[in-house]
Amino acid sequence: MTTTNAVKTKNIGYITQIIGPVMDVKFSPGKMPNIYNALIVNGKNEAGDEISVTCEVQQLLGDNKVRAISMSGTDGLMRGMEVLDTGAPLSVPVGEATLGRIFNVLGEPVDNLGPVANKSTLPIHRDPPAFTELDTKLSIFETGIKVVDLLAPYRRGGKIGLFGGAGVGKTVLIMELINNIAKAHGGVSVFGGVGERTREGNDLYQEMKESKVINEENLSESKVALVYGQMNEPPGARMRVGLTALTMAEYFRDVNNQDVLLFIDNIFRFVQAGSEVSALLGRMPSAVGYQPTLSREMGTLQERITSTKKGSITSIQAVYVPADDLTDPAPATTFAHLDATTVLSRGLAAKGIYPAVDPLDSTSTMLQPWIVGEEHYDTAQRVKQTLQRYKELQDIIAILGLDELSEEDRLTVARARKIERFLSQPFFVAEVFTGSPGKYVSLADTIKGFLMILSGELDSLPEQAFYLVGDIGEAIAKAEKLKDK
């Protein structure tokens, strides 16, 4: 969807060259479009079928020519075809009408549910908020998920990296966060699927409908808007789909004054698409073949994700690490922007501990005593120390057994196993599958529960009482039930 200032005067050029998704277009002298302007190619292919392709101007070449990158396939395009300069960047629909819908990079709905009702649109290329508008207070974004809030808390308006392989619960964690921000913060979420599998996008949509994150009967009650630019799309679409999702999120923050969660899956694919476009435009590659503009492209996206005095955008970004090499320029550039990392562990998932967030690998810059308070900080450190000691003792236990440990170490192991189980939690969005009602646990209740375990007050309770419960009161009640049995 594009806004049209220049359409009245019909600034029309024609295609002079097509190389894959890149095309050169010649305009009349003095009628050159600006960088980032959207161009539309309308015409018919040789079979007589209508073609409509949107491109974005990337370079001004001289001799009245521009080089543009296509946002969809260029099949059927020919030299000499007319190209219309819209006179403005790509613009996409924003507002409540986007909730419950799936869009492509152009802001066109692709869910077969008809056109979008509202008429508000915004350009995808926008400046980040001015310094004077930023909210500089360091505040925690409470998620209601114990392991996250206690050990790797999210910053309101911050950026979080989500690391994890296939099948360890990334999608369920994402859906729970979408659900909790709607219930606890009255906020909405925008999901940007950047260069990932179409099947995964479809699975996510179906799961969101099942768990009522998307309400089919009344779309306005949905909690999320979806924007997809999957891996079968041309690099131009994959490079810009993150900006489309971000623009929709900015509207909820700046106009509706809401707290917004922005999910980007996967931020590595955004860099990868930029690398492909850079090569197609003939730029000299930088380290490891990446684009020379890598840091600027990443900064342009990340600097728009922030808290203002009106609302906040908190972003959770899945990070693929190529060949597990953390020094690769793509993940290394991403790390510079992150406030916290949530690492999902296959070992914990195998034990049935969900969410399978690794308590020792996950980190946050917010876990400082002057930000979260002394009690929270001390509790988190003691929990980590206990779990770390348990990890060190596991080899000894495997070889010699528990009986060979000292009394103190046996107590540490018993408490660590309770802590490990108490870090699990039933999710609202998993109710359909587990039959257990979901639980939102406040930060105060989380700290209180872990302090009680660490102090030894609950040493007499069986460890299974702590598995998949909400607050500590539930664990005590569960222990009573187990005793009665």
From Swiss-Prot:
Q: What is its EC number?
A: 7.1.2.2
Residues annotated as coiled-coil are none
Report the locations given in the UniProt record. Plastid, Chloroplast thylakoid membrane
User: InterPro entries in the record, alphabetically?
Assistant: AAA+_ATPase, ATP-synt_VA_C, ATP_synth_F1_bsu, ATPase_a/bsu_AS, ATPase_alpha/beta_chains, ATPase_F1/V1/A1_a/bsu_N, ATPase_F1/V1/A1_a/bsu_N_sf, ATPase_F1/V1/A1_a/bsu_nucl-bd
Annotated keywords: ATP synthesis, ATP-binding, CF(1), Chloroplast, Hydrogen ion transport, Ion transport, Membrane, Nucleotide-binding, Plastid, Thylakoid, Translocase, Transport
| Domain of life according to the entry | Eukaryota
Sequence positions that bind ATP? G164, G165, A166, G167, V168, G169, K170, T171
> What is this protein's record name?
ATP synthase subunit beta, chloroplastic
Q: Which Pfam families match?
A: ATP-synt_ab (PF00006), ATP-synt_ab_N (PF02874), ATP-synt_VA_C (PF22919)
**PANTHER family attached to this UniProt entry:** ATP SYNTHASE, ATP SYNTHASE SUBUNIT BETA, MITOCHONDRIAL
Organismal lineage: Eukaryota, Viridiplantae, Streptophyta, Chlorokybophyceae, Chlorokybales
UniProt gene name: atpB
Main localization of the protein? plastid
Record SMART domains? AAA
- Membrane topology annotation: Peripheral membrane protein
Cellular component GO terms held in the UniProt record: chloroplast thylakoid membrane; mitochondrion; proton-transporting ATP synthase complex
GO terms assigned for molecular function: ATP binding; ATP hydrolysis activity; proton-transporting ATP synthase activity, rotational mechanism
